[in-house]
Amino acid sequence: MTGIATALRSESPVLHIGGQGAMTQHKMGSLQDLPHVDIAAPITKFSAGVRSTERIADMISIAARECFAGAPGPSYLEIPRDVLDREVAVNDVIIPEPGRYRASTRSIGDPADIEKLASLLVKSERPAILLGTQVWTCRGHEEAIGLLRGLNIPGYMNGSARGLLPPDDPHYFHRTRADAFKKADVIVIVGTPFDFRMGYGKRLRADATVVQIDMDYRTVVKNRDVSLGLVGHPGAILKAVLDVTTDIADNGAKRRRGWLEQLRAIEKEKTEKLMPLFKSDSIPIHPYRVAWEINEFLNEDTIYIGDGGDVVTISAQAVQPRAPGNWMDPGALGGLGVGTGFALASGLAHPKKEVLCYYGDGSFGMTAFDIETANRFGAPFIAVIGNNSAMNQIRYGQLAKYGEERGNVGNLLGDVPFSKFAEMLGGYGEEVRDCNEIGPALQRARESVKSGGKSAVINIWVDPSEWAPGTKRQTMYK
């Protein structure tokens, strides 16, 4: 159920099909008889049961269609055993045709709002655009990139949108989002809600013109007022805006060179301040060093997955995916244990790509044995663990509130040599305690996965007394 809830908060269009006891045994106590439809209803866009064999295909199409109606999300469909097993005449079955069971969702909303947004951006001196998960989910990234480049606007990415621009792109910005939002005169938020990751909308400049674009009308203007709200397909909207500006002689692109140069200088300064952490040679290993080494290891075909608390927060500062679709994390729900499932799915969907999942030791323990599942299905991957022998993000808050005596209750995990998991399954495992061995260990894991077809586990022992700044500030609660 946590996986379904993760799909809901991450706006992932996943169709879940579950079983049920025979309808003839309803309420008789049949095997695993539970109200699955009712349980799934609050965490899906659509939850229903099939009551007729003739309707199975039709109901599947309805559930799939709901996954893509408005903002994407999960559906749940229950098929009782006798409904599934019964044979019926094919002429009595409703079978929707592929490609014809749902309408296009590339709506741009009110054309007048497109004109308003185009005018705002053209006149803006210091615009900033944040591209969220929806931009990648609905495959609107090319249109988004076109707008950034066409109008010379700095772009920031969060969630699954990370990687839409390569790190060396002149319109890619990473560390200066807070700076841009404090100084920008126009801020456009595309496909991401004002949730805890965005400070519920409170971190934007108070007098800035704020525009929000989203596929779900319920998300627009939630948690804060905006100057202009557009409901529709992010890619279609951004393309329509760019099309309007092509007829304008001065779209402001040249005027904004100084604005981008200013942000670039701050980016450089902030990166330089982080370098001592990224290059730290401390013992135990600093978690920032691990994230930096992983970033240096990635290539254009590596799908990076973060599964944990602090490891995700820290890696978001260091890891810069090289291509669209190459970043996955627990999403807005923030639940641990997603990594192995994400890695398995990524390997099956993109068998020619390399998959690397960076876990905390707490999250790795939740799904470690499914590495065998990944191997069995031909989807081996590289598992890297930042092991501090604790549920450390939770531990920080507990220590701060209750002190050493009571703060360590339930969050210390012990020293586990997780590399043994890979070895017992026929893959490569290595324990790393020297920061200079991180890179070589990752290379050995890569070579082993390629040559042996089994997942590799690199267990890196990190300092439990180091935390991400967001953890120290407890920003997830503010």
What positions do the PLM features span?
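N-terminal alpha/beta PP-like core and its mobile active-site loop of ThDP/TPP-dependent enzymes
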Residues: 1-249, 254, 293, 297-300, ...
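Thiamine diphosphate
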Residues: 1-23, 177, 183-186, 191-195, 205, 376-469, 474-477, ...
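A general structural motif
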Residues: 28-30, 103-116, 285-286, 308-311, ...
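Short glycine-enriched loops at secondary-structure junctions
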Residues: 32, 82-83, 216, 307-312, ...
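Flexible, glycine/charged-enriched surface loops at secondary-structure junctions
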Residues: 72-76, 248-266, 453-457
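Hydrophobic, well-ordered secondary-structure elements that form the walls
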Residues: 210, 294, 306, 345, ...
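Active-site diphosphate/adenylate-binding microenvironment
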Residues: 264-347
